[in-house]
Every structure is written in C-alpha cells, then in structure tokens.
UniProtKB/Swiss-Prot annotation:
Belongs to the universal ribosomal protein uS19 family. This is Small ribosomal subunit protein uS19. It comes from the Bacteria. The lineage of its organism: Bacteria, Bacillati, Bacillota, Bacilli, Lactobacillales. It comes from Pediococcus pentosaceus (strain ATCC 25745 / CCUG 21536 / LMG 10740 / 183-1w). Gene3D superfamilies: 30s Ribosomal Protein S19, Chain A.
Amino acid sequence: MGRSLKKGPFADEHLLKKVDAQKDQDKKPVIKTWSRRSTIFPSFIGCTIAVYDGRKHVPVYIQDDMVGHKLGEFVPTRTFRGHGGDDKKTSGK
C-alpha cells in the first residue's frame, strides 16, 4: 500500500536543506545521506547524492525520470553472487 495522497511526498528536512544550499553554489559537491526513504523532488535534479547501502555511500546522479521515486530504489543493499551450480571439477566418479 502506498502513501496517502493527502499527506504528500516525504523527504528528510536535513536533506532538503543541503540541496537548497547547494543550488546557490557553482560547484556541486556530493551530498552524503543515510535517508533512503526520502522521495526525490524536482529540486534534486542535477545533484549527486551519495546514498548509504549498509557499508558504503554510493553516488547517484539525479535525473528527470527519477523524480517521485525513493533514493533507496537506486542503491541495492544486497549483492547477488549467483545460485549454487554443478561443480564438475569436484565430482570424482
């Protein structure tokens, strides 16, 4: 179930303040955040936000088509290493 429309989208206040402060600067440093739950607003477009995946911050460049999604959608938390397969080398028949 999604979020109620009457509540509106959510973004952490500290993240909004950092993005607004960065819009005034010419040089745009990477913004570090742990807030994977924040919704991407149109004001975020053009910013690079480093989102925490549980062990490191992964930089994400915000584009037009990302607006409305959550930051955590673009940084997976789990690494898929593949399913177990037949190991032909060790079967000693």
